């Protein structure tokens, strides 16, 4: 079951944490035309920017939902960033080997109830 951040990233917790941006974030951005994926081996810190997504409206930073090391990236997004608009919850950005998982990640119900 996915957990969510206040900055609209989702994280599927497991042996590696799979992450992406929420449907709300994708809808707010509009048509996504480019994503700068993080690099495998890149250290990331929960709540800190790890990559960027560019839409027809804006360029936005994507924050890491957990602290750890990127172990895999979804290279399909390099050629088809619009996959995020089509199904944000399936179009994962990367997988992170987590060393710290913040306690303030929200359930889907908590995220849906949050003022956006």
Where are these regions (language model features)?
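Acidic, low-complexity mobile loops and tails
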Residues: 1-52, 82, 86-116
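Charged, alpha-helix-enriched surfaces in structured cytosolic catalytic cores
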Residues: 65, 79, 106
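Generic hydrophobic/packing signal
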Residues: 66, 74, 97-100
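Short, surface-exposed secondary-structure boundary micro-motifs
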Residues: 49, 55-56, 75
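Short, Lys/Arg- and Gly-enriched loop/turn segments at beta-strand edges
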Residues: 54-63, 80-83
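ATP/adenylate-binding site constellation spanning eukaryotic-like Ser/Thr protein kinases
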Residues: 64-67, 89
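Short, conserved beta-turn/loop elements at beta-strand boundaries and strand-helix junctions
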Residues: 13-16, 59, 73-80
């Amino acid at each position: 079951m996915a957990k969510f951040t206040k900055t609209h990233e989702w994280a599927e917790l497991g042996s590696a944490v799979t992450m992406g941006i929420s449907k709300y974030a994708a809808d707010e951005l509009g048509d996504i035309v480019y994503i700068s994926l993080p690099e495998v081996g890149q250290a990331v810190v929960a709540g800190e920017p790890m990559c960027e997504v560019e839409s027809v409206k804006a360029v936005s930073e994507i924050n890491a939902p957990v602290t750890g090391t990127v172990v895999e990236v979804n290279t399909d997004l390099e050629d088809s960033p619009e996959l995020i608009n089509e199904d944000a919850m399936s179009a994962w950005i990367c997988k992170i080997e987590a060393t710290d998982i913040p306690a303030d990640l929200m359930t889907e119900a908590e995220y849906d109830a949050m003022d956006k």
